[in-house]
Amino acid sequence: SLVELGKMILQETGKNPVTSYGAYGCNCGVLGSGKPKDATDRCCYVHKCCYKKLTDCDPKKDRYSYSWKDKTIVCGENNSCLKELCECDKAVAICLRENLDTYNKKYNYLKPFCKKADPC
């Protein structure tokens, strides 16, 4: 769910997921879609594509369990869809951390300027 995703982003990046990524670029946040503006925005684009592959669970609402061991996210689900959901969220959180150097405040609230993205 959005709760676990937010916790993962905070743990990996140290940034508030809502204020830092909730309206970032063309793809971060619930309403985002469009050609990525930078590597950070591309993380969110890939994340949305990952979500599109999930058919048996709701990424925004369905809860899953994970642990934070030695600064590493460990998904802990037996249900295959929830495990995949956790892995999608884990991947975006790690991607955002790995691309912290591309984060640019000018890309917050950019949605009206987004061009159509390539399909996943």
Swiss-Prot record:
It is found in: Secreted. CDD domains: PLA2c (cd00125). One of its GO terms (biological process) is arachidonate secretion. Disulfide bonds join 26-114, 28-44, 43-95, 49-120, 50-88, 57-81, 75-86. Pfam families: Phospholip_A2_1 (PF00068). Expressed by the venom gland. GO terms for molecular function: calcium ion binding; calcium-dependent phospholipase A2 activity; phospholipid binding; toxin activity. The keyword Ribonucleoprotein does not apply. GO terms for cellular component: extracellular region. Its main location: secreted. Snake venom phospholipase A2 homolog that lacks enzymatic activity. Shows moderate cytotoxicity against C2C12 myotubes (activity above 200 ug/mL). Also shows antibacterial activity against both Gram-positive and Gram-negative bacteria. A model of myotoxic mechanism has been proposed: an apo Lys49-PLA2 is activated by the entrance of a hydrophobic molecule (e.g. fatty acid) at the hydrophobic channel of the protein leading to a reorientation of a monomer. This protein corresponds to 0.8% of the venom protein content. Belongs to the phospholipase A2 family. Group II subfamily. K49 sub-subfamily. Monomer. This is Basic phospholipase A2 homolog LmutTX.
